Amino acid sequence: MKKESLADKLARKSFESAAFQQSWQVHMQAFGPILEPAFAGNYQAKIHLCAALNHISKRQLTQGLSTLKKLEKLLETDADKCAYLFFLGVFSEMAGNQEQWLALYTMANEYGHKLYLPYMKVGKFYLNGRMYEKAEENYRDAIDCFTATGLSAQDKIILGSAYGNLASCLLQMHRYEEAEAALNTSRSLQPDAPGRAAIEAPLYALRGDGEKVKECLETLKAHAPAIVNTIQESTDRILAKTDPLFFPQPLDHEKISAFWVWFGDYEDTLSGLLSQEDYEKALTPVAEKLLETFPFLEEIPNVALGKNEQGWVIRLQDLYAVAIMDAYEKLLAACPEGIQSRWQFDVAHE
């Protein structure tokens, strides 16, 4: 067993003091599942970590970050690394650096900790970005942080919200029965959650239940007026079976044929730009032509690039929209054999 140094003894004495414990317990209430296993027996590290968190609570970001960085040389276990990455993410989020906090929370989450908060934040980011599979994964990880028994009132609110957001992901991926089951769980945990009507309304519309849709819209008018018009427009389209997220749209087959004529003329330019590694310039005209071919897209679609042993792969992303899935299926079915022999195409949800 390693002999305790004088510095360790002083740090332990400070850590065990009433004043320090008062501050530490406040942080434990917020971040316990990450703090508890981190830096076990390393009181010097815990002193630095608590000091950094005190700076966080006062929004003293520069001082807090410099204090937190002192932990970098003290990382030994996965729990230590998880805590370090997570709190770096907290600082990045408070500083408004979205790309950085997303990366840091994601790295912390890979350690499988039991704090729901970063999973919820990452899940919300992916849900807003229409990356529903990743959003689902993070919401399920958040749900797994809670035990089935002994839930506090606050736990039930958070868990109810997680199930509601999970239902939203499942709805967008057309897994309607699973979405309904998640909503039922959300209702049982959090009966009074008027904002949930924004998720319930499209499900009722897909069933053709106009009366239930009206009830949801009335709830939103009273509790979330800022979003009611958007939800109503969506449910009106669903009830009329014209929403491209859920229903196929009329296609102009002459435009589909014209797309391939255009692509044949563009091949040499495309090959040249790809050889120069000017990928964005190469793919932008393809995306713009897709919008011209399928006007219901309303905005330039996502077109990505891959490569395998046969060569380039042009990847079209349908984002789980039924109309786009149908349109791309018809488009690729009409691809001339000559173009198929020179280019590869596939369709991905995300």
Tell where the protein language model's regions lie, with residue ranges.
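Start-of-helix register in tetratricopeptide repeats
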Residues: 46, 80-83, 117, 154, ...
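Terminal, low-structured helical/coil segments at or just beyond the last alpha-helical repeat
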Residues: 2-4, 219-249
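Flexible helix-coil transition and linker loops at the boundaries of alpha-helical arrays
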Residues: 33-42, 70-81, 108-110, 144-156
